[in-house]
Amino acid sequence: MTLQTEYEFTLPKGYIDSQGNLHRDGRMRLATAADEILPLRDPRVKSNPAYLTVIVLSRVVTQLGGLGELNPNIVEGLFVEDLAHLQQLYRRINGEDGQAEVQTASGLGE
């Protein structure tokens, strides 16, 4: 039996980059303890605890369309529906009792 550590997803709307390209398909990996602990040291999280979601997702989303490495600026640029979709996926694959305050939007399905 093997442990699945990466999960594919398709964003409902998709991220539009600076050239106007749409990126919808991606991959998310299971979170590690470091993914939830290290962002707590980030000054952006200290001044705005809600920013934890942005940092954590930028660490665990390993691919989004043809983009290179994902960073917090890309996560900030997601449509709200897409952010909620990723939060829901994060909670589903990592269990409901994770430490990161990644919340789902009610009523959104995957």
Task: Describe the residue ranges of each PLM region.
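Short, surface-exposed, charged amphipathic helix/loop patches that serve as local interaction elements
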Residues: 1-110
